[in-house]
Every structure is written in C-alpha cells, then in structure tokens.
Amino acid sequence: MSNTLKITLVKSLIGTPKQQRNVVAGLGLKKLNTTVVRSDTPEIRGMINKISHMLHIA
C-alpha cells in the first residue's frame, strides 16, 4: 500500500484558473472534500505539485 496516495481536495475551485481546474479533474476530484486513491507515479506527483495548495495528501 506504500505506492498509493490518498488525495483530498480541501480548497474550493471557485476563482481558480482553468488550468488548475483541469488538473483537479485529471486527478479525478469533483467536489470539495472528496478523496481519491492514486498510484504514486511521477505524473501524479507532477499534478499534485501544480495544485499542492488545494490538496491534502495522506
């Protein structure tokens, strides 16, 4: 289980640039406080780095 990440959206998408909203959608997050489990790959890490201020990673 160490090669997976629990990603939670903790900040609203209102007023964010379209690029950030696209990254959130690419991670599979839809609403505030939703959580998804994704594999720990460089692609996912890159997406997380772009919107790290909006996420909680466990």
From Swiss-Prot:
Pfam family of the protein (one): Ribosomal_L30
Coiled coil: none
GO MF: structural constituent of ribosome
Keyword Transferase among record annotations: no
UniProt signal peptide: none
Alphabetical UniProt keywords: Ribonucleoprotein, Ribosomal protein
InterPro entries: Ribo_uL30_ferredoxin-like_sf, Ribosomal_uL30_bac-type, Ribosomal_uL30_ferredoxin-like
GO-annotated biological processes: translation
CC terms in the record's Gene Ontology section: cytosolic large ribosomal subunit
PANTHER family: LARGE RIBOSOMAL SUBUNIT PROTEIN UL30M, MITOCHONDRIAL RIBOSOMAL PROTEIN L30
Subunit-structure text: Part of the 50S ribosomal subunit.
Family named by the database record: Belongs to the universal ribosomal protein uL30 family.
Protein name: Large ribosomal subunit protein uL30
Species whose genome carries this gene: Pelobacter propionicus (strain DSM 2379 / NBRC 103807 / OttBd1)
Phylogenetic placement of the source organism: Bacteria, Pseudomonadati, Thermodesulfobacteriota, Desulfuromonadia, Desulfuromonadales
Gene: rpmD
